[in-house]
Amino acid sequence: YTKKAQDLPALDHIKTSSDNTRSYGMILKNLFLKNELDCNAKYRQIFTECEEKLDTSDEILQISDFSRFLISCIDIPELIAARRSNYHFLTLELQKIGLQPVCALAENDCPLVFPLRVKNRDSFRSYLMEHKIYCAVHWPFDHFRPEFRPMAQKNAETLISLPIDQRYQKNDMTYLRDIIFQYGGELLF
């Protein structure tokens, strides 16, 4: 599993075996987001299947040589500044409805996501997906000895990673905020 460093096709995938399912999913997502094809249900199915495969995989994954080259062309300070700006925007805005990030951002941190603890995480995640906001689950629970791992189970049920990467501008973060504000379900504990 990798995070996108840029919105470039070569960075949208990782090297695994010859299974092209994830690539098909990314193509469907792109077509759906551009309103060229109503394929969101199929994309969501592929997305879920790929997450399950990655969660249970013991295969060593690696980045392609072309992706490594593209990464060397990225302006890292600009990337960090954009991510930090998006993180701070959501921190200030979501405080208005009582939501706080799971952790504070230290001075030199470059956040990958905006981690948020919410009630009914899966329902909230589905709601966001209906509005074209896709949040990965970084804390799946394997159900191994849950009686000895209550915090792992709690994290799996309540943590969501909101997207804040450098592709998103202020209008995107405003859209995300507005969709969260409009959510009809209960988020606070």
Segments (PLM) and residue ranges:
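PLP-dependent aminotransferase class I/II
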Residues: 5-189
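Hydrophobic alpha-helical segments with transmembrane-like composition
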Residues: 1-2
